[in-house]
């Protein structure tokens, strides 16, 4: 028996029918709409396939970060589902920097981070501080909800900026769909 080859666990990628995902999404109690469509399926395929090892890292990191996110969101009375935003924004990497300069778990742009009290200078970048950035993000999300009143628009505005969402609403003649 060659232990190295015969006893090694194989990386199995589970495959589920569309109905399984639909049923699981229906069972999630949330005030934030969670649609299932081709784009969602594409991300499910990506994260259960070639990015599977990233998911392992994120699951491990979530044990540390999720309680911080939850506390900040609860402080501002926000839906706890928003704790998954940094998973999408940064893959739970506190040192992540996007191609446009958004930094940290919550991917704050410089001006937005400073507007929400995060210190950024040559010595420190609090956008990378999990606790301070989480409270700043919760404050920002709360402000966005006061403006848009719809969680899908809030999430979109968080990602691309409120000005872009306002322009899209204006182009669609006021429709928020």
Could you say what each language-model-derived stretch is?
Residues 1-76:
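An acidic, Gly/Ser/Thr/Pro-rich helix-cap/linker signature
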Residues 162:
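Active-site-adjacent helix/loop patches that line small-molecule binding or acyl-intermediate pockets
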Residues 78-95, 154-159:
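Short, functionally critical alpha-helical segments immediately adjacent to catalytic or ligand/cofactor-binding
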Residues 43-57, 92-102, 107-153, 169-177:
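Substrate-binding clefts and substrate-entry loops adjacent to catalytic sites
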Residues 75-78, 147:
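Membrane-interface junctions
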Residues 67, 71, 83, 135-142, ...:
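Solvent-exposed, polar/charged alpha-helical surfaces in well-ordered, non-transmembrane soluble domains
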């Amino acid at each position: 028996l060659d232990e190295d080859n015969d006893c090694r666990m194989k990386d199995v990628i589970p495959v589920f029918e569309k109905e399984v995902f639909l049923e699981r999404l229906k069972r999630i109690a949330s005030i934030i709409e969670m649609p299932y469509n081709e784009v969602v399926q594409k991300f499910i395929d990506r994260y259960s396939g070639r990015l599977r090892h990233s998911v392992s890292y994120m699951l491990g990191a979530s044990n540390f970060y999720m309680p911080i996110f939850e506390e900040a969101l609860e402080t501002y009375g926000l839906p706890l589902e928003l704790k998954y935003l940094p998973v999408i924004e940064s893959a739970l990497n506190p040192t992540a920097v996007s191609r446009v300069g958004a930094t940290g778990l919550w991917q704050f742009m410089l001006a937005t981070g400073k507007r929400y009290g995060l210190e950024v200078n040559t010595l420190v970048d609090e956008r990378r501080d999990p606790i301070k950035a989480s409270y700043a993000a919760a404050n920002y999300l709360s402000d966005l909800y006061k403006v848009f009143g719809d969680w899908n628009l809030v999430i979109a505005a968080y990602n691309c900026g409120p000005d872009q969402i306002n322009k899209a609403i204006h182009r669609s003649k006021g429709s928020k769909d």
